[in-house]
UniProtKB/Swiss-Prot annotation:
The keyword Methyltransferase applies. The lineage of its organism: Bacteria, Pseudomonadati, Pseudomonadota, Gammaproteobacteria, Legionellales. It catalyses: S-adenosyl-L-methionine + a thiopurine = S-adenosyl-L-homocysteine + a thiopurine S-methylether. This is Thiopurine S-methyltransferase. Keywords: Cytoplasm, Methyltransferase, S-adenosyl-L-methionine, Transferase. It is an enzyme of class 2 (transferase).
């Protein structure tokens, strides 16, 4: 287990998961239509944790594929929502699945890409910003390989003064987004908003009082 894997496993084991939200993300509800997902389309949720957004997407009629490093997160997800799953193990990857939900427990960078069928859309609420800068290019490449031509990504990022603190969540500038996805057909900024950090926010406790939130729709050519 490398340093990054140990870090995330420790957070889940100790219950330090302030990044997990109990409510469906309002930006997903507001902007999911911009993805133009076909009926019964496949949606990838990378670094999914136990996000309730996955359940919301399933209830909209989509097939959700989640990838998560920490098995405890997936086990909590299926237990908390009383989901009856089947199990499978392929190499180092463990799979929990139903007819419309496919959850992989593995390092996304080590997952055999052939195990993920092409998806119609990707929903990234907190995956890109969870990764240090040196890993983000590889992450983008992997996700784009899984995305069908013409498919779209709903991506949430944030930006703050990195001189004060390093993430996660990491600050990702609009310039980095433009560079990272320059091979795509369209990069559209759907939302840009300043947000004052509340005392229970992780970044507030690290000395960050204000962040810029961004929501992007990125379409693959």
């Amino acid at each position: 287990m490398n340093k990054g894997q140990y870090f995330w496993n420790e957070l889940w084991c100790e219950g330090r998961i302030s990044f997990h939200k109990e409510e469906v993300n309002p930006d997903l509800i507001a902007y999911v239509s911009s993805l133009n997902i076909p009926a019964k389309g496949r949606v990838l949720v990378p670094l999914c944790g136990k996000s309730v957004d996955m359940l919301w997407l399933v209830r909209q009629g989509y097939h959700v594929v989640g990838i998560e490093l920490v098995e405890k997160a997936i086990l909590q997800f299926v237990q908390e929502h009383q989901i009856t799953v089947r199990e499978n193990t392929i190499g180092q990857a463990k799979q929990y699945f139903t007819d419309n939900l496919n959850l992989w427990v593995t390092d996304i960078f080590a997952l055999n890409s052939a195990l993920i069928e092409p998806v119609d859309a990707i929903y990234d609420r907190a995956a890109l910003v969870a990764l240090p800068k040196k890993l983000r290019p590889a992450y983008v490449d992997i996700c784009l390989k899984w995305l069908k031509p013409g498919g779209s990504i709903l991506l949430k990022t944030l930006q703050y003064n990195q001189e004060k603190v390093q993430g996660p969540p990491y600050s990702v500038s609009p310039e980095e987004i433009a560079l990272s996805y320059q091979q795509c057909a369209k990069i559209e900024l759907l939302k840009s908003q300043k947000r004052i950090q509340e005392p229970n926010d992780h970044l507030f406790n690290l000395g960050i009082s204000e962040v810029n939130d961004y929501v992007w729709c990125i379409r693959k050519g």
